[in-house]
Structures are given as structure tokens and as C-alpha cells.
Amino acid sequence: MVDVNRLKEEVIASYREICKENYRLLVFIVGPPGSGKSTIAEKLKDAINTSYLDYLKEIDRKTLRCENYNHINIDQFVQGIEGETISSALEDERHENFDSVENVDFICKKKRLKDGSYTITGRGGQLNAIKVRQPTSQEKNLEGNTTIAEVLPMDGFHLSRECLDHFSDPQWAHLRRGSSLTFDSNNFLKLCEIMAKTSRIFPSIGYDGDDFTAFDAISSSFDCSVPSVEVPGFDHSLKDPQPSQHTISFKSRIVIFEGLYLLYNKENWSKIYNIVSNSNAKLFYKILACEDQIESRVAKRHLKAGLVASIEDGKDKFRKNDLLNARDVEKNSISSEDIRLIRND
């Protein structure tokens, strides 16, 4: 059993260490199917937000500051991303052209919209698109239940079933959905680049010296010129990703990524660790769990989702796909002394 409260304290302490130099902390929770990474990420988010809301009850909310400290132009967050600004006509053409669905070297494209925001698309097209935009008036409101932690699941970057239909071997693609090639890793990498850039924004905290807490630093330095980033999520009822299911706003000072391939040392996934490490504002947690335990959990999940008719069928499905993916990642995983290991058997 993972001690989420201990994780919360570690994350908040880590934010305090970087709060004078970095606007946000990026936390990565990595683990095989059935390891509990999604549950842990959500519980960690809730624990952090609950602690912050408790903090707000004890202070004068008038001390919350939201300013345009850095007068940020969102163009800087899409500059340096490989690709080019594209026309609507070219975007429409790409929707009908699935030649690139297996191309892990696909160059992501960006489109500037009339309101000045950008959409960034990879080989998965619009369903896996990212949007970078200015904060709305509603987002700038610091009244009510201001939350500072958000979760970004990797699941929103599953390639759609329509994309899988256009693989050279569509039967394999559908059978092995969840393997690394069946994700839009191109666009997920762009998301990591964007989030790393936002973490390097200099925070204008309202304290001198060191006599302040992490929550003091956060409350004194909300910068409403930091862009909002909209990210796809996976709709289980549709069995496909949908755009703009998660929003990271300027209030999101701790962003928790969760997924299987975040430390995978192949193709686009292999670049994530170095990109976020260069921001000096990251924490990686790798979840360990025995195969028997994750098999049991995933089989029950498959049965509950109606994907199989029995627990035994669920175990068979796990062994033919989920287990293969888990073993592949374990065999080809980035290792580093700063990756923290936690067990969830």
C-alpha cells in the first residue's frame, strides 16, 4: 500500500526547494498496467489540493496575488517546436490522410487560431491535439476553491480506433492497443516540451529570505499571463481519445503526469526524461508491483469494463497484451539515481 500522505509531503517539500526559480513542479508517476498509478496520481492530487484549501482557510485570502508578472506571449511556448504553421486546408487534408499513423518521426504541426491560441497536432490528428491559449476571465478568478495540483494522464494520447484501422497490420494494432506504437508519442513529447518551458517561468514570490512555506510562495506568485494548456483525455464510453479534456492553467503549480511509457527508453518516449530534467523542476516515481498482483487487478478491470466475459478471459487478455507491454518497458526503462521507487503490491 502506497502512503499517499508521505508522497504529498515529499512533493510539497520538493516544490519549496525550487519555488524561487521555477513556476511549477512536474511530477511523473510511472508504472505497469495494474500498478495503481492512475489511482495514486488522483489521490496525490486530491491530498495536495485538500492541504492547500486547508491552508487558505487559515490566511487572509486577500494575500492571494494574481498579476501579469512576466507579460508572457504564448508564441514563445510553440517556438522551437518542430513543425510549421499550417492552413485550414492542409489540416483538413491531414484528417483524410492516415499515411503517417505509424511514423514515430512525424513532424508535429501547429495552427494559429483567430483568437491567438494554437493547436498542435501529431500523427493522431485532432483527437490527440494540444491547445495553448490565454487564460479566460473565469480562470483568473482566485475566489472559491482554488486548486494547485492537476493530473495529466497519458491515456489521452491513445491513437483512435480509426487511426489503428489504417496501420499496415490493423488486426495487430487493435489487438495490441496500449503498446507504445499505438500512442501519439510525437504529440505527447511536444506536451512535455511545453510543460517544461512553463516550469522554467520565473516566479515573482512575495517573500524575501527563507521564512515562508511552499504554499506561501504559491499564493504570492500566481501569474495570470502563464498560458493555459488543454490536453486530450480518453473517453471510455467512446473507446477513443477526445481533445480538451484536461486543462492546465496558471493556477496549476504541481502537474502530475501518469502513464506506462514515461521512462521508456525507445523512440519519442526516450526524450521525455532529459527534456523535463533540464527544467530542474521534476520528480519521478516508479511503481513496482509483482506480476501476479497486476494480472489480478487488470483482469478484474477488463471484466468490469465489459471487455471480457470472465476473470480467466481477463487474465488471458492481460497476458497477450498488457503483460507484454509491461515487460517491454521494464526491459527498456531509463534508470537514474533520482528516480524514486515505491511498491504497490
UniProtKB/Swiss-Prot annotation:
Enzyme class of the recorded protein, top EC level: transferase
Keyword set, alphabetical order: ATP-binding, Kinase, Nucleotide-binding, Transferase
EC number: 2.7.1.-
Domain of life: Eukaryota
Positions of ATP binding: 31-39
Keyword Kinase in record: yes
Gene Ontology MF terms: ATP binding; ATP hydrolysis activity; kinase activity
The keyword ATP-binding is assigned to this record: yes
InterPro entries (UniProt xref): P-loop_NTPase
Similarity comment text for this entry: Belongs to the YFH7 family.
PANTHER family per the UniProt record, alphabetical: URIDINE KINASE
Job of this protein: ATP-dependent kinase that could be involved in endoplasmic reticulum membrane assembly.
Name of the protein in its database record: ATP-dependent kinase YFH7
Organism the protein comes from: Candida glabrata (strain ATCC 2001 / BCRC 20586 / JCM 3761 / NBRC 0622 / NRRL Y-65 / CBS 138) (Yeast)
Record lineage: Eukaryota, Fungi, Dikarya, Ascomycota, Saccharomycotina
